[in-house]
A protein has these predicted regions:
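Conserved alpha-helical scaffold segments that buttress catalytic/binding sites
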Residues: 2-49, 54-196
């Protein structure tokens, strides 16, 4: 089971968070996969958060992402009057190879989708969208994708899935699962006529 690959959040990180400052916040409403509490039962939750460190196939020179900073800001947000249960399942570490990371992410997404759980991925690079997209293969629904990017990432230069080729792989995927693709923020001077 790929969920067992998820690393818990360190107790030292959770102790840094001032609960008084975060009163009424998301932090006080969610169950967190921590060193002390272990992995929450994901079947009890409507929304699960997962941090992903993988960025080796990013188009951009990248350094390790600071998922702690992302979480600190996310946890500060106020929880509305919603009737949903939310869990932070921790972080998926890099696999030995990028393909190992893709496979683990695919399995996690597929498992959570089978329980009708909404998955929110934090971190990682654009190419991770491909294994997430592929996890919908066993579902009847078509997939809508919204990307916020200055380019369309439709390059066809190689078989490698990267931050510049992932959308081409999705659009021409044999599963025909893509219903709609919307790109927000593309810059005309960075996109070829063929892409537009």
């Amino acid at each position: 089971m790929s969920l067992e690959l998820l690393k818990p959040l360190k107790n030292s990180f959770l102790n840094e968070i001032d609960e008084n400052y975060l009163q009424g916040s998301l932090y006080n409403k969610i169950k967190i996969h921590s060193e002390s509490d272990g992995l929450p039962n994901h079947e009890l939750f409507d929304v699960c958060l997962v941090g992903v460190e993988e960025n080796r196939n990013s188009f951009f020179e990248s350094k390790k992402q600071n998922l702690k900073s992302i979480r600190k800001e996310l946890y500060k947000l106020k929880f509305g009057n919603w009737k949903i249960e939310v869990s932070d399942l921790g972080d998926l570490p890099n696999g030995e190879t990028v393909d190992d990371s893709y496979h683990a992410l695919y399995d996690i997404c597929k498992e959570l989708l089978s329980k009708k759980t909404i998955l929110v991925i934090m971190g990682g690079s654009n190419d991770l969208l491909y294994p997430i997209f592929k996890s919908f293969d066993t579902h009847n629904e078509k997939v809508n994708i919204v990307s916020i990017d200055n380019q369309f990432d439709l390059y066809q230069d190689s078989d490698l899935i990267s931050g510049r080729t992932y959308m081409n792989k999705i659009i021409f995927d044999d599963s025909n699962k893509l219903n709609d693709f919307t790109n927000i923020g593309f810059q005309r001077h960075l996109c070829s006529i063929d892409e537009i």
